[in-house]
A protein has these predicted regions:
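Short beta-strand/loop segments at the ligand-binding rim of alpha/beta enzyme cores
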Residues: 21-23, 93-102, 118-119, 185-189
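N-terminal amphipathic alpha-helix/helix-capping segment at the start of soluble metabolic enzymes
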Residues: 1-31, 173, 180-184
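Conserved anion-binding
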Residues: 29-31, 67-70, 109, 115, ...
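Glycine-rich anion/phosphate-binding loops
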Residues: 34-53, 78-82, 125-130, 166-172
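Active-site mouth loops of central-metabolism enzymes
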Residues: 26-47, 72-73, 98-100, 154-166
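Glycine-rich, proline-tolerant flexible connector loops at the mouths of alpha/beta enzymes
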Residues: 33-35, 58-85
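Alpha-helix-loop-beta-strand connector modules within alpha/beta enzyme cores
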Residues: 72-101, 106-110, 137-148, 170
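Conserved, mostly hydrophobic/aromatic
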Residues: 27, 52, 56, 102, ...
Length: 191
């Protein structure tokens, strides 16, 4: 049985073929990321991005708030201060690059897209900010929905599943339905 080929995704006025896997390079503009080698300032972000793109990354994902288990939430203003200069610099240096903003906050998503990001990667799938899904629908950008129980502060405290595969599948189906109800096209969703 063959799988259907997904429709291309429109990103930065170009169609992106998602028939195969795409490598996403991670650029953390945060001092407390769980992956120390990905923590960067603006100049280092430009060097890291160039290397990642040369090595085949199709997407560069910029985050300014750690989502590692137990991470303490940073203020929205601090997250904006961390990510916007990086997004702006990457957009200037690599205008064809597919930039993703890793955030669960709708304001950060909106500002980052205005600065040059072309995709929103949301660990909360719209549950940590009630305005996220409507904002993404308004922005008309691809939206990465992820699964997490609780918040980064609590997600590993006592995760409980009776049937993890079915429960995660049900969760993601509910979030897909919420995105569709808000007007996000199916071919703009990444699960």
């Amino acid at each position: 049985m063959s799988r259907p080929t997904p429709d291309p995704m429109r990103v930065k006025d170009r169609l992106r073929d998602l028939a195969g896997p795409a490598v996403m390079g991670i650029i953390n503009a945060t001092p407390d990321s769980f992956h120390a080698a990905s923590r960067v300032d603006v100049d280092e972000a430009l060097r890291v991005a160039e290397r990642m793109l040369n090595e085949g990354a199709a997407i560069l994902d910029i985050g300014g708030a750690s989502s590692r288990p137990g991470a303490v939430a940073v203020a929205e203003t601090e997250e904006l201060k961390r990510v916007l200069p990086v997004v702006e610099a990457l957009q200037r240096r690599f205008p064809e690059a597919w930039l993703s903003i890793d955030t669960y906050r709708s304001t950060v998503a909106r500002e980052a897209v205005a600065a040059g990001a072309s995709m929103v990667n949301d660990i909360g799938a719209g549950l940590l900010d009630a305005n996220m899904i409507p904002t993404v629908a308004m922005l008309h950008v691809p939206y990465v929905l992820m699964h997490m129980q609780g918040t980064p502060q609590t997600m590993q405290a006592n995760p409980q599943y009776h049937n993890i595969v079915h429960e995660v599948k049900d969760f993601l189906q509910q979030r897909i339905q919420a995105a569709a109800a808000a007007g996000i096209a199916e071919n703009r969703l990444v699960i």
